[in-house]
């Protein structure tokens, strides 16, 4: 008898995982999603889903477009999502955000937050802010 273990990505926020289930990338609300189900996803629209923790977003390694507008986010680590082109973080709780690793970023919407500073000096492709 052999056991096959598949890589899983930890997603502790139930609202985040439920949104992934609703999109068909997961099927059980258990804090985990098969990494193979999400690592080639090109776009995520998670608008007004009451998400407050995006732990697990790093599993979406091929993500080009990400819309997280209207959630309860105050922190997100997008450093592993290196191919991101378009990001909408409007209407959250951000005071700061580090996008220095997202050098392919072309469009960023981040209005209606609590930003005190935003460093986009490394985002040389950024055309829309």
Name each region found by the language model.
Residues 41-46, 66-68, 85-89, 106-110, ...:
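Conserved hydrophobic beta-strand positions in leucine-rich repeat
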């Amino acid at each position: 008898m052999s056991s096959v273990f598949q890589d899983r990505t930890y997603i502790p926020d139930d609202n985040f995982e439920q949104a992934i289930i609703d999109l068909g990338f997961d099927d059980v609300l258990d804090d985990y999603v098969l990494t193979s189900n999400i690592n080639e996803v090109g776009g995520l629209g998670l608008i007004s889903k009451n998400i407050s923790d995006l732990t697990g977003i790093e599993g979406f390694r091929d993500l080009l477009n990400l819309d997280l507008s209207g959630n309860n986010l105050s922190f997100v680590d997008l450093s592993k999502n290196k191919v991101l082109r378009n990001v909408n973080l409007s209407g959250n709780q951000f005071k700061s955000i580090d996008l220095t690793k997202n050098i392919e970023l072309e469009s960023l919407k981040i209005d209606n937050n609590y930003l005190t500073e935003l460093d986009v000096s490394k985002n040389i492709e950024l055309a829309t802010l």
